[in-house]
Amino acid sequence: MLRSLLVATLFLSAWNVRAQFNISGTILDAKYNRTLAGATVQVDGNKTGVVTDEFGRFLIDKLAAGEHALVVKFLGYADRTENVNLQSHVSLELALDETSVLTEEVVVNATRANEKTPTTFININKQAIQKQNFGQDLPLILNWTPSVVTTSDAGAGVGYTGIRIRGSDATRVNVTINGIPYNDSESQSTFWVDIPDIASSTQSIQIQRGVGSSTNGAGAFGASVNVQTNSLQSDPYAEVITAAGSFNTQRYTFRAGTGLIGDRWAFDAKVSKITSNGYVERASSDLGSYYFSGGYYGKKTVIKAITFGGNEKTYQSWYGVDAATLSTNRRMNNAGAIYDASGNISGYYDNQADDYKQDHYQLHISQQLGGHWNANASLHYTWGRGFYEEYHQAATFNELGLADVTIKDTTLTSTDVIVRKWLDNKFYGGTWSFNYNQGKSDLVIGGAYNQYGGARHFGEIIWAQYAGLMPIRHHYYEGKSQKNDFNTFVKWNFDVTERINMFMDVQYRHVDYSTAGIRDDQRSYDLNESFSFFNPKVGVTFFLSEKTLLYSSYAIANREPNRSDYLDGTVKPRPERLGNIELGLRRKTSRYSVEANYYLMNYTDQLVLTGQLDNAGFPIRANIGKSYRTGIELSAIIRFSDRWTWNVNATGSINKNQDYVILENNVPLTKNTSIILSPGLIGGSQLTCNIFRHLQATWMSKYVGKQYLSNTEDENLTLNSYFINDVRLSFQILPKGVKEIGISLLVNNVFDVSYSSNGYSYSGTPYYYPQAGRNFMAMMTLKF
């Protein structure tokens, strides 16, 4: 009997030592009872912890029986500590209270939508961004969000990339970084290649589709992308990321931060290097970037200084390939080609490159005022400078603004030259907002004044076959530009009843733009334009329950033409006007979240792509009178179990020019044609399986429907539909001595589909931008 009791005691003791249990649960907002995605849950002082998923859920497994302390942290909320006596598997529901301590989020809140805003938007948190960040440009990371189509000139996602949302290209998508406009003031486009690997310094991104709420910079005519860079990390950290893959693509990133020093100060730093040969021939990229910040964090005051930027050198791959070349040599790149007397390519100029550097400086000050008010002010300065270099054969001296050269008795009218086309510009100004939050009423009064000043466009000749009396680095064209942009807005969200919320948003914007000089074709230009715009928005949100809401809104937006519209268009361009209706439903439970919305975007004098490019590879646009985009967007995140999650979206749309004039047999006809590069169907899917706690696999699929390369709806000028599948594997190891080792593998285009994601037409000939077939990226992350 004694022996049996001893054996049983030893057995139970051994079982108790070896017993391992799980703690799972959901993190909620105490005020609104909504789940919080991206909250950190730490156990027993482990600084690594886990991060809640899209449904605010977490799982910590393999914990020994006994007492454990959970600490939950989320930006803008007070930390919560929960003690758990673990004797079996435990499931918790923990609510966090909003903190009265000021956080950095107030800097972007003035231009972001929230749960009560009756507009269509999606938030992407840091966890989701980092999962997909293998070193590709930010548009490729956003590829899986609704109504998005992305493209890469080099075909592999590194270098020049583009994004279209609801069929609208980058010139029509407003981008802000910490509330500061990022779109180039003159072209209105965004060049993510100038700030490579900005994703590794990003805390969150909000995409508003349609007009959205008032923001700084050129108005959103398809969508807005609101980027917030890294926020405070209270604990010290260091991180080393290395990645390598197809086309000799390599990425090296180092990040570190001091954590909170003396409960007041914090400093962060990042440097990054990305190189790639590109899928397209010679489409190489050599990219470097940095991010440094220092902040003071008081209970009622936050002051943060940030500088970030990058330098890029990319071999040009701007012109695509024609259909015949696409079928025989899809990686062909004509940029830099040198032709012999017979018209055959005899070689390539080795420095047909784009070389540009951009530095950003931002100072943000946030102050908690008395009562329910806080104030924010930001100053910013951006300096960009660089050139693209090109080899030109048989350029006439007349084109170069020079006299013909006479050698003995022979007069030469042309010469081979190497030119550099420069842009040196500065962008500076300030933004401000006053925010009032009283629970039932949210009021934002804000605005900005920005100046694009001292911008110089000039070209220099660095070599000529026949120079004559040409001086060294002769400037054969030069011009200057300045643009002043002022806006002020008022946004008011107020509860009419417990279930009905009204939203009103009014913005006034004034723009002065002047530019003068000589173009690269020796034509002179002198523009002086002023615009005043009034952009009202109104909407209502109905809370059917704590989990379900309906919203509807109507918004008006106006915007000015860009530089190219004036210089490359055949007639003087007119400002555009957009009326946008949004109707939507959102429902979120612990198992799924779903959103369905209808949109109508009615344009007057929309500037649409003509399908042609200027001599720098930029699309040419023209006013077309009336046009519209209308469609239905569906998106859902479904949690089938703790192991399986499906993130899926689909957009069906009609995009039409209502009175586009087409010449048929020299007779002008008005037709209802499809808008260029606007697919009628876009779908995205991410099916994720948590194979076990530290191993995750995701199957990603993207479908993009047929697109026209001309507004004439010519069936010979089309971009075929494509369906692409990728696979991502992520594995974490938690060894002693480091917080975490992460190993990830990304297989793009698993089925090796030959496709093109972008194109244009020139003189009735289609040109395409082919994308890479099956390719790989592997990444290792060390966290300390």
What are the residue ranges of the model-derived segments?
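Structural signature of Gram-negative outer-membrane beta-barrels, strongest in the C-terminal barrel
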Residues: 448-450, 476-603, 639-641, 651
